[in-house]
Design a protein with these regions (language model features):
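Aromatic-rich carbohydrate-binding modules that target alpha-glucans
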Residues: 4-58, 68-90
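Aromatic- and glycine-enriched glycan-recognition loops and surfaces
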Residues: 44-58, 141-172
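Extracellular/periplasmic catalytic domains that process cell-envelope and extracellular macromolecules
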Residues: 17, 56-57, 127-131, 160-161
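Hydrophobic core residues within well-ordered beta-strands of beta-rich domains
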Residues: 3-5, 61, 134
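Core domains of carbohydrate- and sulfate-ester-processing enzymes
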Residues: 63, 67-122
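Non-catalytic, glycine-rich low-complexity segments
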Residues: 1-17, 97-103, 125
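Aromatic-rich, solvent-exposed beta-strand/loop patch
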Residues: 120-139
Length: 172
């Protein structure tokens, strides 16, 4: 199995300017700006990129991009396309979420190369016409008092009464 990941971050403002450097920091390098995490610049695409090897495909890893210029403090950015976001302000109230990394700043992204397969319980389920869906974007933490799936499921009648035909779960 492949144990490598390619990270890419677009970094160009409305004036065409970008940061002078970008490092990837995460669980695997103790959230430190190290040479092996220095990302390459592709000026034509406006992106920073790096390919890293040696990840355990079954393990989840957390990371951030650390951008900066010669003067001033670094900016810490999560990946805008991540499926999982860890939040230092709210996650401390969720018992099953791992402790927020002490050296990280702001929001933290996560990835896992080999995600566990979901075992569907209803094999005969049919999705309605995708052009006729009424989608409700739901974040458990903000939707119910208990901030979990049980609290959300207890309010499915409310969602159905709104005319919603599909629920999109937002990242945790």
């Amino acid at each position: 199995a492949d144990n490598s990941v390619t990270f890419v971050l677009y970094d160009k403002d409305t004036k065409g300017q970008s940061h002078k450097y970008c490092y990837i920091v995460g669980d695997w390098n103790n959230w430190e700006r190290v040479k092996e995490g220095s990302m390459f610049r592709d000026n034509s695409a406006g992106c920073w990129w790096i390919k890293l090897d040696g990840f355990d495909p079954t393990k989840e890893y957390r990371f951030q991009y650390r951008l900066g210029n010669e003067s001033g403090a670094d900016t810490f950015v999560s990946d805008p396309y991540t499926e999982i976001v860890y939040d230092q302000w709210n996650d401390k109230y969720i018992s099953w979420v791992p402790e927020f990394p002490e050296a990280a700043r702001q929001l933290v992204s996560a990835f896992q190369i080999q995600k566990p397969q979901y075992a569907w319980k209803h094999k005969d389920f049919k999705v309605q016409d995708k052009n006729d869906l009424v989608i409700y974007e739901m974040h458990f933490r903000d939707f119910s008092a208990t901030k979990d799936i049980a609290g959300a499921m207890a309010q499915l009648d409310y969602i159905q009464n709104l005319g919603v035909t599909a629920v999109e779960l937002m990242p945790i």
